[in-house]
Amino acid sequence: NHGPRTSQGFRAGPNNIFFGAMDAVRDRPGYSLYVETDCVPVRPDWLGQINRHLQGAEPAWVTGSIYRGPDALGPREKRHINGNAVYATHDPAFQHFVDTVWRPRLAELVVQHPELPFDCVIEALYELADGRLATDNPDWELMRHASHKFRYSALIPNLAGSECSLHDL
């Protein structure tokens, strides 16, 4: 959060790389695995395990890990699915969600929260969604219809800042 602040927030670089990657693979068949440069495989046959999981799983737009490290997290981070995840880039409905919700809502939210990364936007939308207002709250309506498309998985563990042993996985 201490880098240069632009109109796109402190994390403009990583956010733009993510959306650029989503654009680059949008017309390719299948799923896409997005892996940032600070991530490494930690078990044999990791890619095969991910592929086998996708073959048997109910279709999801995003499959990834909740934060499993020891550090305290704020409200927009506590349940977010880490960006190092599998994305249903072949699904036109997912691409529509990226184009009409994810990217534009990030652009809106970074004005007030310049530290917001792309992978915390969904959690931020949950924070804004007020189910007590039901259909009078567009964020609640949106998340009520899209929530089942976001899945937690232990296949790509988010252990940032952790002293966790690989045997714990």
Question: Which residues fall in each region the model found?
Answer:
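Catalytic core and acceptor-binding pocket of nucleotide-sugar-dependent glycosyltransferases
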Residues: 41-45, 56-169
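Non-transmembrane alpha-helical segments in soluble domains
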Residues: 22, 51, 122-126
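Alpha-helical elements of Rossmann-like donor-binding domains used by nucleotide-donor carbohydrate transfer enzymes
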Residues: 16-20, 45-53
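Short beta-strand-to-loop acidic/aromatic patch adjacent to the donor-nucleotide binding site
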Residues: 28-40
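Secondary-structure boundary elements
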Residues: 24-30, 52-60
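Short capping loops/turns at secondary-structure boundaries
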Residues: 11-14, 39-43
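Active-site-proximal specificity loops/subdomain of glycosyltransferases
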Residues: 1-30
